[in-house]
Amino acid sequence: HKLDSFIGLM
């Protein structure tokens, strides 16, 4: 998921 990837780079 896009949101999951966004959180992954946090």
From Swiss-Prot:
It comes from the Eukaryota. InterPro entries: Tachy_Neuro_lke_CS. One of its GO terms (biological process) is neuropeptide signaling pathway. Its main location: secreted. Signal peptide: none annotated. One of its GO terms (cellular component) is extracellular region. It is found in: Secreted. Keywords: Amidation, Neuropeptide, Secreted. Belongs to the tachykinin family. Tachykinins are active peptides which excite neurons, evoke behavioral responses, are potent vasodilators and secretagogues, and contract (directly or indirectly) many smooth muscles. This is Neurokinin-A. The lineage of its organism: Eukaryota, Metazoa, Chordata, Craniata, Vertebrata.
